[in-house]
């Protein structure tokens, strides 16, 4: 039996009869937490979020309370803005979609609470352009909330004023990067900003302090205020609190989204029990654990994971991929990351060079073109993979791939540099023999299913 | 770009009202409305023409180049018309693993989209259909995924494509009568 899900964020999302209407949300206790929050001093909400240990669900896993704490409200004289990052552009991720399409008022309630805590009076939801229907749902939900006085001039008689608008992106991955998102919202090309300042909390939208949080993160805030930070922190494991929605796609029998407390389930349990195993009874070959930018993990490799013992000391434990618990820190200890929670599974029939070529094409297409190493390097890597896959590989190619990748990471304005080089570095390191065989044009790999039937 | 007022298509009152409503959502800087207005223009006219860029620029007190640079940056904003029915098939890994390349080829064949008008973009001779590859549509658990105009389709199969095309052709005939 597969472990039962613990649905906090998606509690009602798939319930029969549950709709996106405000009346449905209200009849399920909706906006009650907002009432509670508006009676609290804003700093107390920030404190509860700090105590909860909530970490951002967009990919980087940065502590939300710490991010909020960067604004000094005593000294600040500028307006503060709250932005909801609903760009959900990391390949493999489809969790925010579930919230937006099925429970939009939960997001709005979370946003009003977060905006109140951060003294913001204007907030935007930056939603990816492809979610045309999602934007419509949100617009309607916001109008309903406005009508019922959960938004507007004097919310529930508290004197607090907030307006939220929806802003649609237009198909650019880079808008998920928070400073790119801000530039885009300012009506410019989404070129990420030079750091420092490292956080838009210092200089953000219209050069004012700005908090950018992911959709799921903002929903968690609602639950933290509801149950209290300390109680929330009991879900999950220390430093990995709360639930996470894992999005599984690729070669499993039951792909989908599954919500569990952090660390409550291992890769093996998730893939074999929850997701019904690998398709066609095939063998697991590799897993990308946190969206396509995360480093790929090989199924037959042992990973050295530091583990805290009861006396407080740390020991190194060897673990197979299947035994690794899904949280932030353990996945990070493998050298990869749990990122946005997008888990892409590949079975033993997959040609890893083709898989990497697919990912490399994504990054070559999505590089914003601002920094030379990324703009040139992402395309160069894609071209090299094209030629390896179409029979024109050269013996030195995998070394050259690594060399190009190593010269991008750490040399760009934003983390896209890492995002496009990590897959290349990890695929070549983990599956070097496949690359070399392909470069030598050995036919032993012909049994592998081609990912594409195109001719480049 | 030398678009003058007389080149502009006749804009309906409701279009201008909608534009004003959008601009009002950006009280701090009108410039923020550039991309939303490009979306609005494209929804109305199918693509963004130089006249569209000019009109938006004037509306927002910007140089046309400031709008043009946005229009050319974002993949969803088009500078030329595409098919009346636009298939956008996800190309990224999870969908590719689930056979999106085959789906792409199947739509290409079924819709006779023979003219390649851009990288991974094909249009049929009569201009009714276009097929293009797009990057991740964020529905990877239901791969392969595609969009038909602004509508999302999950777990796409060749049978589903056949059914969709049959439906579209029937609708089209109804319109012609």
Description of each model-found segment:
Chain B
Residues 1-177:
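Signature of N-terminal electron-transfer/Fe-S-associated modules in redox systems
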